[in-house]
């Protein structure tokens, strides 16, 4: 859409009542975000259940903390980088086919991990899983830009990210319950049942995606013409004043030449750093306080996720109302950095340790909700995909290095103290980079209603 056409959409949008616009977006959110929420819960169960399975995998497959995390992240990361570019094809083949393919493959591969018997099979399974899952996260972020203008994006992204919290809240007790009650059922070990029962639903959900999702508002049969017009006008008004890129061959290169893309990549890298502690080490940290019952560990592991979910909703709402991103991101990150630095000094107290994990969860969920609302605010439609892809790919450095480093440090020193302190410092540095290097006037967002 041209700049003139986008500008013409603004008065059309203003002629409609605030209540009518909100009603349309509630309808869109109920339809799309319910499905995406459940899909992401199933996706993130894989990250939660591996933290509970690691005790059994180390025993049955003969791997140390360092070996388990280094090899797993190495093969996962390499194929993730290959597959991460696939989400750009979402614009060509559509969200329905893309999400269907990703979910069916990851569900089947995740369930197949129940039948691995050697470390090599574990590495292969994780590599294939990384390739299958690649593109889901950035693809969904891009998909949301087809439906929601910038002023709504942090809040709607936070609802999407609530699925991660839900996966932690559900996954901990569920994994603990399966590991407790499925010991030697039908001749299979408890961790085998966990992978099967938590993997296959994703494949089923993938098939459902083909029949349930549509690629863009124009194709939605569940919207009438006026509702479609409201959404399209809101998106057009959001694009008003942005410089269009007409040469698609150079659109991605234009995004990669923007130094703010690399600053945001550094900021995004801090999020998986926090996620490493929360998603992979929470059960271990809780067990180290003296709590050994796997079901109790699972129940207590939900506390940080609950706190993080509540904080994310409040942070995202505040950010959207004020149309301010940088400070919200920084203070979210700083809170988690403090929690990571304090955690090594309170390992004997379950209550204080869980409090520190909750602080990290606030950082993890709050920062993730904010940072993905920044790129679309200053990148036009054609370069947004390139910018989001670059940020996601470069930010995976944090996701790649953190588990390896923590695993190695824990194996060598017998403690997570040094690793947690280093992560706290890196997280704070990433937050400061976004706050200082991204100009506030670069985030050209406009409120679309009087909210």
Swiss-Prot record:
Keyword Chaperone assigned: no
One Gene Ontology cellular component annotation held by this UniProt entry: plasma membrane
CDD domains documented for this protein: MFS_ExuT_GudP_like
InterPro entries (UniProt xref): MFS, MFS_dom, MFS_trans_sf
Subcellular location(s) of the protein: Cell membrane
Domain of life: Bacteria
Keywords: Aromatic hydrocarbons catabolism, Cell membrane, Membrane, Plasmid, Transmembrane, Transmembrane helix, Transport
GO biological process, one term: phthalate catabolic process
UniProt pathway: Xenobiotic degradation; phthalate degradation
Single Gene Ontology MF annotation: transmembrane transporter activity
Primary residence: membrane
Matches recorded under Gene3D superfamilies: MFS general substrate transporter like domains (1.20.1250.20)
Parts of the chain that traverse the membrane: 119-137, 170-188, 191-213, 260-278, 331-342, 354-377, 386-408, 416-439
Family: Belongs to the major facilitator superfamily. Phthalate permease family.
Name recorded for this polypeptide: Phthalate transporter
Gene source species: Pseudomonas putida
């Amino acid at each position: 859409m041209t700049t003139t056409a986008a500008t013409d959409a603004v008065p059309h949008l203003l002629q409609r009542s605030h209540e009518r616009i909100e009603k349309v977006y509630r309808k869109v959110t109920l339809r799309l975000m319910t499905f995406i929420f459940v899909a992401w819960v199933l996706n993130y169960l894989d990250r939660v259940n591996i933290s509970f399975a690691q005790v059994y995998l180390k025993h049955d497959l003969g791997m140390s903390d360092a070996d388990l995390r280094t090899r797993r992240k190495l093969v996962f990361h390499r194929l993730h980088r290959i597959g991460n570019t696939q989400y750009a094809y979402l614009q060509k083949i559509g969200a329905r086919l893309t999400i269907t393919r990703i979910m069916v493959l990851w569900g089947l591969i995740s369930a197949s991990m129940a039948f691995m018997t050697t470390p090599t099979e574990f590495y292969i399974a994780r590599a294939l899983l990384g390739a299958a899952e690649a593109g889901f996260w950035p693809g969904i972020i891009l998909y949301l830009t087809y439906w929601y203008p910038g002023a709504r994006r942090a809040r709607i992204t936070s609802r999407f990210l609530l699925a991660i919290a839900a996966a932690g809240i559900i996954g901990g007790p569920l994994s603990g319950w399966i590991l407790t009650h499925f010991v030697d059922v039908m001749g299979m070990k408890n961790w085998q049942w966990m992978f099967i029962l938590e993997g296959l639903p994703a494949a089923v959900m993938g098939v459902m995606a083909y029949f349930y999702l549509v690629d863009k508002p124009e194709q939605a049969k569940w919207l009438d013409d006026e509702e479609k017009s409201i959404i399209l006008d809101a998106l057009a008004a959001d694009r008003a004043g942005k410089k269009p890129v007409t040469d698609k061959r150079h659109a991605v290169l234009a995004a990669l030449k923007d130094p703010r893309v690399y600053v945001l990549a550094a900021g995004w890298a801090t999020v998986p750093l926090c996620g490493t502690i929360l998603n992979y080490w929470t059960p271990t940290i809780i067990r180290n306080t003296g709590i050994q019952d796997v079901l109790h560990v699972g129940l207590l592991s939900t506390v940080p996720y609950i706190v993080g979910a509540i904080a994310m909703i409040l942070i995202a709402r505040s950010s959207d109302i004020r149309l301010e991103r940088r400070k919200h991101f920084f203070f979210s990150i700083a809170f988690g950095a403090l929690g990571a630095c304090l955690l090594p000094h309170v390992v004997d107290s379950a209550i204080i340790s869980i409090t520190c994990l909750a602080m990290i969860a606030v950082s993890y969920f709050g920062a993730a909700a904010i940072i993905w609302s920044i790129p679309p605010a200053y990148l036009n439609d054609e370069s947004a995909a390139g910018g989001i892809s670059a940020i996601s790919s470069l930010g995976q450095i944090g996701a790649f290095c953190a588990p390896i480093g923590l695993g190695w440090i824990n194996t060598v020193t017998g403690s997570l103290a040094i690793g947690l302190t280093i992560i706290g410092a890196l997280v704070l540095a990433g937050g400061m980079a976004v706050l200082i290097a991204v100009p506030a006037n670069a985030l050209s967002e406009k409120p679309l209603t009087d909210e």
